[in-house]
């Protein structure tokens, strides 16, 4: 985006102001035709004759001709720019006043059709030339014109003093003709040159500012401040969103680790369940417990003690004796306490009972569990029993 300094912005505002003023003060375009002359047909000879007559009665150049020449350098001269304002004092005294007034009236009627058109073309050409040169060049031309106007102010004052005397000697018809044929541009020029202090030209641009070329003028930048404030607000909001996104990413980065830890926990719990399934807590009186729910159900049954003397008759022998075991529990048959002497080593019966309980507790197919039980019954050594146990655990 292009940036401008304060001086350049001021120049742009001033040039736009001068252009707006020129557009507002511009006069309307005359009636235009396409491919045809603006002069009506049949009036060309009359206009040329009027121009020749005007040239024949034109007085010699006065002392204010340098000012006119300087003005004609800026604007292209047309037949109607040559004012007939000085013509009434310079008319010959040989002609009667009525004849001079009649000729001037005929000239005005003949040239009236093209006066407005030519004056409008002159104004448009002056404005187009000023627009091409730029306001700075018009100011320089105005400065060049000021000395010439100051030099021509003294002679013009002399002419202005002589004009009332000549007009006083002229006829009343000449006065009316003079008022009708006076040219506005020449009258404005005489007003500028009259007086001790010359009239200051209006400046379309401040002289202290740097001139700006019309060819390189860019668009005004009034909306830059609003755009900058909007961009700053948007950048702040974007930074806040970025910070929140960073926090969210930091929090979500731990999700894969949590998932992996949860998977590991599930795996470890499954392994522990398998180990608990293989490791059976066997109650001496309840060897058929095969699940944790059954074990809990057995644990809910509590022994009940009956206070007071019991009935010892079942445990008293005929001789009035009672046999107690190692736990001081009464035994009905004393032969139960007498165990035969066995060779030291593992008991095959206990091993068989343990493996049989393991086979029945495992969730296996009934045919495979029946085969293992048949092999267990036929086993006669500890090694065979252990092989059957491995098959039950693995299968």
Curated annotation (Swiss-Prot):
Family membership: Belongs to the rubulavirus/avulavirus P protein family.
UniProt entry tagged with the keyword Phosphoprotein: yes
Domain of life the protein comes from: Viruses
Ranges of compositional bias, category Basic and acidic residues: 65-74
Composition-biased stretches (Polar residues): 75-98, 146-168, 203-212
Annotated disulfide bonds: none
Organism: Newcastle disease virus (strain Chicken/Australia-Victoria/32) (NDV)
Keyword Phosphoprotein assigned: yes
Protein name: Phosphoprotein
Region (Multimerization): 222-285
Quaternary structure and interacting proteins, as annotated: Homotetramer. Interacts (via multimerization domain) with polymerase L; this interaction forms the polymerase L-P complex. Interacts (via N-terminus) with N0 (via Ncore); this interaction allows P to chaperon N0 to avoid N polymerization before encapsidation. Interacts (via C-terminus) with N-RNA template; this interaction positions the polymerase on the template for both transcription and replication.
Role noted for this protein: Essential cofactor of the RNA polymerase L that plays a central role in the transcription and replication by forming the polymerase complex with RNA polymerase L and recruiting L to the genomic N-RNA template for RNA synthesis. Also plays a central role in the encapsidation of nascent RNA chains by forming the encapsidation complex with the nucleocapsid protein N (N-P complex). Acts as a chaperone for newly synthesized free N protein, so-called N0, allowing encapsidation of nascent RNA chains during replication.
Residue segments, region Disordered: 31-109, 126-214
């Amino acid at each position: 985006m292009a940036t401008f300094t304060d001086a350049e912005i001021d120049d742009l505002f001033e040039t736009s102001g001068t252009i707006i003023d020129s557009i507002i003060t511009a006069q309307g375009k005359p009636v235009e035709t396409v491919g045809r002359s603006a002069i009506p047909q049949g009036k060309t000879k009359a206009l040329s004759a009027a121009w020749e007559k005007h040239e024949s009665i034109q007085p010699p150049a006065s002392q204010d001709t340098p000012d006119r020449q300087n003005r004609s350098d800026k604007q292209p001269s047309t037949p109607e720019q040559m004012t007939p304002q000085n013509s009434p004092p310079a008319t010959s005294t040989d002609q009667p006043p009525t004849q001079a007034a009649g000729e001037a009236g005929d000239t005005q009627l003949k040239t009236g059709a093209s006066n407005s058109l030519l004056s409008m073309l002159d104004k448009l050409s002056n404005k187009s030339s000023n627009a091409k040169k730029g306001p700075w060049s018009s100011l320089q031309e105005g400065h060049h014109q000021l000395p010439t106007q100051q030099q021509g102010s003294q002679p013009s004052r002399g002419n202005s003093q002589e004009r009332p005397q000549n007009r006083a000697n002229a006829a009343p018809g000449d006065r009316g003709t003079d008022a009708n044929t006076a040219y506005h541009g020449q009258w404005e020029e005489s007003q500028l040159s009259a007086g001790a202090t010359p009239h200051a030209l209006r400046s379309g641009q401040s002289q202290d500012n740097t001139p700006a070329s019309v060819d390189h003028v860019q668009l005004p930048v009034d909306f830059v401040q609003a755009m900058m404030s909007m961009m700053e607000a948007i950048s702040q909001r974007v930074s806040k969103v970025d910070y929140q996104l960073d926090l969210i990413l930091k929090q979500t980065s731990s999700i894969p680790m949590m998932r992996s830890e949860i998977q590991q926990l599930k795996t470890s719990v499954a392994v522990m369940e398998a180990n608990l399934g293989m490791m059976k807590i066997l109650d001496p009186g309840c060897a058929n417990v095969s699940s944790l729910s059954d074990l809990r159900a057995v644990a809910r049954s509590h022994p009940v003690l009956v206070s007071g003397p019991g009935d010892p008759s079942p445990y008293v022998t005929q001789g009035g004796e009672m046999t107690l075991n190692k736990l001081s529990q009464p035994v009905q048959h004393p032969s139960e306490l007498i165990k035969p002497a066995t060779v030291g080593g593992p008991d095959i019966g206990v091993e068989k009972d343990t493996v049989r309980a393991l086979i029945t507790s495992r969730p296996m197919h009934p045919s495979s569990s029946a085969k293992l039980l048949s092999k267990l019954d036929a086993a006669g050594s500890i090694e065979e029993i252990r092989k059957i146990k491995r098959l039950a655990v693995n299968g």
